């Protein structure tokens, strides 16, 4: 059990026998009336995001979540195979466990997988990854000062928008949460 004072992003709550992960929360103390906590909760099974308000100080049941560092090995077509870095035990994860971030998975990437009662709930990639550009159109000399972007295909097959000065073969840092270009990595 936890109170609203214990809320933090990533905490998994058990509400109506469903596991809900806190994505965002805000403590509100209005000038009139009692304080409350406004939250955005994500159902860990369906991925549906809902808004819920809790009165301040209310006790809420939390789920015991075991987070483990695992290495992504390969995709066998229907699932992603990962290996526990401590026990070398392999597990097959359904595609929804990674969500949209799966498009940035590269072999031997360390991911953090969260389990509840032995069942995988969700997996998180590092916030940023260094990935090589497989293909992008060349930027024209006059285009470089405009600050525009162009599409580029990464070594994982994902497509992102990069600045015009990026060329095929460059290594770039990509934010895995939203797929945005962060910077060019010097080789």
Curated annotation (Swiss-Prot):
GO molecular function: translation elongation factor activity
Superkingdom per UniProt: Bacteria
SMART domains xref list: EFP (SM01185), Elong-fact-P_C (SM00841)
Pathway(s) of this molecule: Protein biosynthesis; polypeptide chain elongation
Gene Ontology terms: biological process: peptide biosynthetic process
PROSITE patterns documented for this protein: EFP
Any Gene Ontology CC annotation: cytoplasm
HAMAP family on file: EF_P (MF_00141)
Protein name per its UniProtKB record: Elongation factor P
